[in-house]
């Protein structure tokens, strides 16, 4: 979702705050390097914590510190804060499908329990089930100031809008 914000919002800097387990399971440095981001400074004691910059001057800071929002960007004079939950998306196993459902509910709940600094977005993997649930939740979430975004297997991001909006689901591909 951090790459999506860099591509679609008027910002040059996005902060990512992974929890400890996410940092152990995901190679942030290699993933950013494949996207032409070079590490320019270090933060904390992890090998991946630090600020990364690409040739266009865009920066991603990876700081494994909890309580700050999973992905945060300042856009103009407001803040976009996203809570993200991952999961296995190419499965029909009932336990995994249930976990994806719970992940969406959990991200919405986390955002509701956090004071809003600006736009709040619940971000989960795109599956048929999460799309249906997101469409059902979208209107109530909008009343609470929470947006829902679903991320597909290839990085495409779909913003789920409440029924009645002109465009219910909008898709943008982010590789």
Stretch-by-stretch model annotation:
Residues 69, 79-80, 138, 169-171, ...:
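Conserved catalytic or regulatory cores that recognize and/or transform ribose-phosphate-containing ligands
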Residues 13-89, 100-103:
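Active-site metal-binding core of divalent-cation-utilizing nuclease and nuclease-like domains
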């Amino acid at each position: 979702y951090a790459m999506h914000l860099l591509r679609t919002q008027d910002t040059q800097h996005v902060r990512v705050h992974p929890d400890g387990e996410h940092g152990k399971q995901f190679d942030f440095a290699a993933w950013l390097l494949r996207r032409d981001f070079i590490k320019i400074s270090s933060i904390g004691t992890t090998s991946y914590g630090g600020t990364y910059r690409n040739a266009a001057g865009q920066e991603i800071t990876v700081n494994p510190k909890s309580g700050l929002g999973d992905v945060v960007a300042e856009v103009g004079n407001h803040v976009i804060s996203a809570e993200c939950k991952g999961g296995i998306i190419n499965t029909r196993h009932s336990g995994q499908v249930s976990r994806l459902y719970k992940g969406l509910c959990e991200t919405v709940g986390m955002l509701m329990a956090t004071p809003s600094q600006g736009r709040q977005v619940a971000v989960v993997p795109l599956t048929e089930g999460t799309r249906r649930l997101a469409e059902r939740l979208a209107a109530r979430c909008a009343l609470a100031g929470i947006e829902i975004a679903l991320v597909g297997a290839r990085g495409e991001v779909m913003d789920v809008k409440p029924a009645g909006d002109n465009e219910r689901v909008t898709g943008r591909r982010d590789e």
